UniProtKB/Swiss-Prot annotation:
One biological process term in Gene Ontology: potassium ion transport
Protein name (database record): Potassium/proton antiporter CemA
Function of the molecule: Contributes to K(+)/H(+) antiport activity by supporting proton efflux to control proton extrusion and homeostasis in chloroplasts in a light-dependent manner to modulate photosynthesis. Prevents excessive induction of non-photochemical quenching (NPQ) under continuous-light conditions. Indirectly promotes efficient inorganic carbon uptake into chloroplasts.
Catalytic activity: K(+)(in) + H(+)(out) = K(+)(out) + H(+)(in)
UniProt similarity note: Belongs to the CemA family.
Keyword Thylakoid: no
Source species, domain of life: Eukaryota
One family name in Pfam for this protein: CemA
Keywords on record: Antiport, Chloroplast, Hydrogen ion transport, Ion transport, Membrane, Plastid, Plastid inner membrane, Potassium, Potassium transport, Transmembrane, Transmembrane helix, Transport
InterPro entries membership: CemA
Transmembrane region(s): 12-32, 114-134, 161-181, 196-216
Keyword Transport: yes
This protein's encoding gene: cemA
């Protein structure tokens, strides 16, 4: 009995270490490959083969809006006396310097986006390979998670279920999904199309909610009917 417990403990600790090391390795690989290996290649391809500064229309709109905001702010500060009076030539030169600054920033952002695409693909390949090679460790972690879930009380299970549903498919979750999609599209250098974002926000949480309810009906209702009953009572 003691020997089996020690073996189980050893397997669990080893699997958790494997999981943590695996996550850290993927994150470090993504960062190193993006910054050191892939970015110089992306910079060469973008600067030598492309004449554009902006990688998509959304990035261009952000730069134009920032330049317009800077110009309006400069005019306002001059009018209220917080900045010295400038002649037309000096004013245009100041705006030009800001435009050059924005152009350089946008160009660097475009290069980063290209490097991010290839770095993410590389990380995905490593992730899949690690899953295939570490089936034993993953199975142990899965058993550990199942044991932890089964050890929870019905009220605790219901609390986490309600928390999960409210965060991901609740009434206010749409704003969070919008931010996540915009950050993801910007990370990959894709245009932040509002129609696509609104369509995703309108459909994906609904699909996720349907899948979750189906899981409760098909799986949780079999292994823990009392937890489902507690969930419905707490939800009401």
């Amino acid at each position: 009995m003691t020997r089996n417990w020690k073996v189980s403990k050893y397997q669990t600790v080893t699997s958790i270490k494997y999981f943590i090391s695996f996550i850290l390795f993927v994150l470090i690989t993504n960062h190193v490959s993006s910054r050191i290996l892939l970015r110089p290649c992306a910079e060469y391809l973008w600067n030598m083969r492309q004449t554009d500064i902006f990688i998509n229309s959304s990035q261009e709109e952000r730069a134009f809006l920032e330049l317009q905001r800077f110009e309006d702010k400069t005019r306002f500060e001059i009018l209220i006396g917080e900045a010295p009076q400038l002649n037309t030539q000096s004013f245009n030169k100041k705006i030009q310097e800001k435009a050059i600054e924005l152009a350089k920033y946008s160009n660097e952002e475009s290069i980063d986006s290209i490097a991010n695409v290839f770095a993410d693909l590389l990380s995905l390949c490593i992730f899949v390979l690690a899953l295939l090679l570490g089936k034993k460790e993953i199975a142990v972690i899965k058993n550990l998670v199942n044991t932890l879930i089964y050890s929870l009380t019905d009220a605790t299970k219901s609390f986490f279920i309600i928390l999960f549903t409210d965060i991901f498919v609740g009434f206010h979750s749409s704003h969070g999904w919008e931010i996540l999609i915009e950050v993801f599209l910007k990370h990959l250098g894709l245009p932040e199309n509002k129609d696509f974002i609104f369509l995703f926000v309108a459909t994906f949480p609904v699909v996720l909610d349907t899948v979750f309810k189906y899981w409760i009906f098909l799986y949780l209702n079999k292994i823990s009917p009392s937890a489902v009953a507690t969930f419905h009572n707490m939800n009401e």
